[in-house]
Amino acid sequence: MKKNPVSIPHTVWHADDIRRGEREAADALGLTLYELMLRAGEAAFQVCRSAYPDARHWLVLCGHGNNGGDGYVVARLAKAVGIEVTLLAQESDKPLPEEAALAREAWLNAGGEIHASNIVWPESVDLIVDALLGTGLQQAPRESISQLIDHANSHPAPIVAVDIPSGLLAETGATPGAVINADQTITFIALKPGLLTGKAWDVTGQLHFDSLGLDSWLAGQETKIQRFSAEQLSHWLKPRRPTSHKGDHGRVVIIGGDHGTAGAIRMTGEAALRAGAGLVRVLTRSENIAPLLTARPELMVHELTMDSLTESLGWADVVVIGPGLGQQEWGKKALQKVENFRKPMLWDADALNLLAINPDKRHNRVITPHPGEAARLLGCSVAEIESDRLHCAQRLVQRYGGVAVLKGAGTVVAAHPDALGIIDVGNAGMASGGMGDVLSGIIGALLGQKLSPYDAACAGCVAHGASADVLAARFGTRGMLATDLFSTLQRIVNPEVTDKNHDESSNSAP
């Protein structure tokens, strides 16, 4: 199961900002860009040595840019300690950047050789270092590099990517063409969005970070993107006052569960309870009342009528609508009534499909689309959504207001004017029915506990993914059910509790 270390930063920089900031930082600290390249190469070399101490023949793939310059430094350091190194370099009519040219010269002066990229690879190669393409890539790699990438991916040796796996777009996490499937990735100066969302989860392997000694400069900079992970839950979820009562923790109304979908509304209701909601009322089809009360007697379950809905809206602190709502007249009428609710609300599932038909803008609303729902909301294809998840989350906010949670690997949370978070928890076990219903209940509960809509969305996504990570660490990802999260969710939303049986290898709160 992929899990990023807690030591990596929680600030994330746009790729263009890093490239500009690198020069500013070097000037501010009296460093040259070549000195930063030497530090990057040293950091990458140390990751290679630490992760693969027995590797004795390294194949270093160097591109024709500063990422390739890092590769020359890695190769020279490896050769200096007696490791056999075969270095393949991409040819180009353009001159190398100054820093990369210096690194290349140092490699040659150390007795290194440079081979054409089309040579037959030695059979003894047991580690591949990817320094082909860096963070400036904005399109699919050209054919000659794609062939190298495919060759590396088909080779049995592990791959360490320098700064970013070649072919992965640093800004978006998209892969428009061939991409290195790295086992380890060492990135420098600051995290890039593309390392945390989209296809990054498939290709980065274990992520490492090195600031290259720029910490003092970085500390004085502001960034608009944040990485959110389980160790931050204690920031949002404080211990409760001993004298608090159920009314203090939110009255949540959940609306949905049309014919045949009682399970969706039941999962949302229980998730809200497990995430700490004081009182949860479910409005649903009359046929669902007995099964829901039998399954979870702590829920208050009523038939959805215009009268019960009107009374419940007056009672509620928060409304969650959508799980199992359907798109027939029953669900449409309920949604029309809820539209003008003035307190926090969350729309999911069929509420989003109906919203796509009749769009409106509400600043007190959290929407939680998966990529298919987001595509309908924005009138585009799923491929367009996945090609730039951060931008699409921001577009959702611009069009619909409030907070947008674009679900998927590396869930993105966006709010006006420029709040942007990437959720760095979760796993492939969550690709199963009902997970979105559970998330809706969790976020709804946190809204009821007086978190701001943006904080509730971020904390809810983290608690959701962290609960699944505990399960994955114990049992694996295959066969995980949405209701399995209830066994770990209570522990996760009480981060102040020390559980001696808690598996610290999981990606959950300490």
What are these model-predicted stretches?
Residues M1-A89, P97, Q184, L195-A349, ...:
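Small-residue (G/A/S/T)-rich helix-start motifs and N-terminal tracts that mark the onset
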Residues V73-N153, A290-L304, T310-W315:
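N-terminal small/polar loop signature for handling phosphorylated ligands or for N-terminal nucleophile
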Residues R104-N109, A178-V179, K199-D202, L396:
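Short, conserved catalytic or adaptor-binding loops enriched in Gly and charged residues
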Residues D126-L127, L132-T223:
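Internal gly/pro-rich beta-alpha loop/helix module
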Residues R104, I145-S146, V179-A182, L335, ...:
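Amphipathic alpha-helical segments in well-structured domains
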